[in-house]
Curated annotation (Swiss-Prot):
Major localization listed first in the record, in broad terms: nucleus
Gene that encodes the chain: PP2A11
Biological role stated in the UniProt entry: Component of SCF(ASK-cullin-F-box) E3 ubiquitin ligase complexes, which may mediate the ubiquitination and subsequent proteasomal degradation of target proteins.
Name of this protein: F-box protein PP2-A11
Pfam families, per database record: F-box (PF00646), PP2 (PF14299)
One GO CC annotation: nucleus
Ranges where the F-box domain occurs: 23-69
Organism: Arabidopsis thaliana (Mouse-ear cress)
GO terms (BP aspect): cellular response to hypoxia; protein ubiquitination
GO molecular function list: carbohydrate binding
Complexes and interactors: Part of a SCF (ASK-cullin-F-box) protein ligase complex. Interacts with SKP1A/ASK1.
Length: 289
């Protein structure tokens, strides 16, 4: 790809007129050839080079260029998000839509396609999870948070039995995915207009470890445990990985949980924001969530 970039950079001037009119340049390439070039670039690069000249702009709308960037099951993904597959959409329009963060399941889930890799990403809010005791205001409450994609998080003040369960049924494209719980020790708030985190009620998480579990309908399973120790910052705790095979052309159902049910002590002061499913190759992008 690097050599392709250098070729473009060396010939940029040829599109604008600082060359001999008898010398061929990028502006002379037929649109069909340009489309074949663009097919080998990532979506961000395609959009950048579409501004180069008329041929590049026209080629950037070719359906076969964007078909290669879309997840193979993009129709199923659109149906899951929208409830039906819209007619008369060009492939570039479909990619543009999917690369935005789209809400579904009454706003409790969000899904999008990574613009660089084309990998599918998904997250489900605390309200989309099954949390033991969530309706008892002595223990749990939903509080607003600017740090959440869903504008609110679940906060446990104090509890003996801590259990959070969830499941996702979605047409994931083939690949390996990682599941994370996004958590924070401490209660978010504001003081004099500044964001603050109150850690006064944080307790009990360094006595016994929290157990994270993940399973799929085809028998994959993983389990891990760790202490929660980092107060005041949002952290992603790995629940496990799962693999979607290339031959699968339907939804994949996963179940996951986070528990600390040792009732010899209470624990509290924890925010549960969401559960995130990300292509394992894109772990470095987690901090952007």
């Amino acid at each position: 790809m690097g050599s392709g970039f250098s070729l473009f950079q060396k010939n940029l001037s040829s599109c604008y007129g600082d060359r001999d009119l008898l010398q061929p340049g990028l502006g002379d390439l037929p649109e069909s050839c340009v489309a074949l070039i663009l097919q080998n670039l990532d979506p961000v690069e395609i959009c950048r080079f579409s501004k180069l000249n008329t041929a590049f702009h026209g080629a950037s709308w070719a359906d076969f260029v964007w078909e290669s960037k879309l997840p193979p099951d993009y129709k199923l993904i659109l149906e899951k998000i929208l409830g039906s597959f819209p007619d008369n959409l060009r492939k570039r329009d479909i990619f543009t839509f999917l690369s935005r963060v789209n809400s579904f399941d009454e706003g409790n889930k969000k899904a999008w396609v990574d613009k660089r890799t084309g990998g599918l990403c998904l997250c489900t809010s605390a309200k989309g999870l099954s949390i033991t005791g969530i309706d008892d205001r002595r223990y749990w409450s939903h509080i607003p948070s600017d740090d959440s994609r869903f504008a609110s998080v679940a906060y446990v003040q104090q509890i003996w039995w801590f259990q959070v369960d969830g499941e996702i049924d979605f047409p994931f494209p083939a690949g390996t995915y990682s599941v994370y719980f996004r958590l924070q020790l401490g209660k978010p708030g504001k003081r004099f207009g500044w964001k603050v985190v109150d850690t006064e009620q944080v307790h009990g998480w360094n006595i016994k470890p929290v157990r994270f579990q993940l399973s799929t309908e085809d028998g994959q399973h993983s389990s891990s445990q760790c202490m929660l120790t980092e107060a005041g910052n949002w952290s992603h705790y790995h629940a496990g990985d799962f693999v979607v095979g290339k031959s699968k052309s339907s939804s994949t159902k996963i179940k996951f949980s986070m528990t600390q049910i040792d009732c010899t002590h209470t624990k509290g002061g924890l925010c549960v924001d969401s559960v995130v499913v990300y292509p394992s190759s894109c772990k470095d992008r987690l901090m952007q969530i």
